[in-house]
């Protein structure tokens, strides 16, 4: 096979990863493609230069297939001809899918620790590169849930710790509980969902990677229609001969060197297009037009 494309990199903890990651969720939940197409999609992302893949044990459809997405990713990496050691796989625990279409939480430390060890087995690794507490559990004190990550770090089960779906106060609390070892925050962020801007800014101040999930607006049509809903991205895309999705991702990358979007994909062509955003060089005027259209004031 030919060598993978090399993309610009950004940093999570002490690891350099591609500026655009791959979100694995769409390949394992409602509307998921078959196994062959999923493997081909992951291979396409790797060949396009993506070296950061995000998954979770809760990315599955039926109650008896916990870790479906982790298993897919492990299989794809094992059958890929490139350097698997160059790829950082991030997973999560603390979310559950009972199998009836709902999502629930289990933030108990004992669950998080057991789930992480099970994830490591499914991924076929001695230590998980990045493990994230998936979502706060209202029935468990946040510090107790994050405390499980401390134990996992100290035991060598995970190499780095992150959190997801967190508020600014929870970010600060996690950083304190982890003794400064928090490396990433993964929150929803896109042109249509910008309520995580305080978290994005706080991560910049703290030197923590910010990982936007659903950076194009989600798999329910938001990603596909982003150029229709936000015409400036389509206009700039036409001017540059690229998709509006690439413009959105390039704009998000411009918000800070700590921002690493993780668009999901069900098809190879989707992630191939998204990966190109890492090299898309928009002018200062074009970036300002994007921000102005969303009512965001940029600092000079």
Feature map (PLM): residue ranges:
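N-terminal binding-site loop/beta-alpha segment at the start of enzyme catalytic domains
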Residues: 1-87
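Structural motif corresponding to the early beta-alpha repeats
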Residues: 59, 80-107
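CE4/NodB-like, metal-dependent polysaccharide N-deacetylase domain
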Residues: 47, 111-132, 152-155, 177
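Short, acidic/polar
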Residues: 33-46, 107-123, 169-172
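A short acidic, helix-capping loop that chelates divalent metal ions and anchors anionic groups
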Residues: 29, 59-63, 96-102, 218-222, ...
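Short, well-ordered coil/turn segments that N-cap beta-strands
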Residues: 15-20, 49-51, 82-87, 125-129, ...
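Beta/alpha (TIM)-barrel catalytic core signal, keyed to glycine-rich beta->alpha loops juxtaposed to Asp/Glu
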Residues: 4, 136-300
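N-terminal small/glycine-rich loop or linker at the start of catalytic domains
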Residues: 13-30, 90-103, 127, 132
